[in-house]
């Protein structure tokens, strides 16, 4: 798996120029500043800019416990939509569909995922076939099989053989004119996505 930061929350040049000295003094991120403005805008009669001008020291200064208290309050109260103004975009490569299924359960994350509908994963395509993730429990070692007495099997060899068979059947479906959006039904949860 490879993860690369593409972009993240950034204050406008106008706001940055107004607050640059304080941002440098307290060593806070643009995301922290944006969060303060958004959170306090919900609970104050002041505008976001007024909050930043008037309350910056209170929340980020030497007595910055107010900032910690405020964040804890927001999380405990479930008012986390105010934190959605902070964003980070990552390029994530080589993770399984199974991992993707777990990640997409989280409301605060948004995804743009390599499509198995619009991309061919046949051996003859530009992709050269589908890549896959081998679970860490699938080891390259010989173990006694529970399927028969005096039989040993290698989990890694078995796993890789299954991936080759799935690739072969996917290729057959594509060669029979089945659209990739339907042929993808045979691809495993171990198939990589970016």
Where do the protein language model's features map onto the residues?
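Family-specific signature for flavin-dependent thymidylate synthase
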Residues: 1-194
């Amino acid at each position: 798996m490879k993860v690369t930061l593409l972009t993240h929350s950034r204050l406008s040049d106008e706001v940055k120029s107004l607050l640059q000295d304080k941002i440098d003094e307290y060593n806070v991120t643009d995301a922290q500043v944006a969060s303060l403005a958004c959170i306090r805008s919900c609970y104050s009669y002041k505008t976001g800019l007024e909050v930043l001008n008037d309350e910056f020291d209170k929340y980020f200064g030497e007595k910055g416990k107010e900032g910690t208290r405020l964040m804890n309050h927001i999380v405990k109260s479930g008012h986390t939509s105010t934190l959605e103004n902070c964003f980070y975009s990552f390029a994530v490569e080589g993770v399984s569909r199974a991992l993707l299924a777990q990640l997409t359960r989280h409301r605060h994350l948004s995804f743009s995922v390599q499509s198995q509908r619009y991309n061919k994963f046949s051996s003859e395509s530009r992709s050269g076939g589908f890549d896959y993730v081998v679970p860490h429990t699938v080891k390259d070692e010989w173990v006694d099989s529970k399927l028969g007495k005096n039989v040993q099997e290698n989990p890694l060899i078995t796993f890789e053989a299954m991936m080759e068979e799935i690739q072969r059947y996917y290729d057959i479906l594509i060669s029979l004119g089945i659209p990739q959006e339907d042929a993808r039904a045979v691809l495993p949860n171990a198939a990589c996505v970016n």
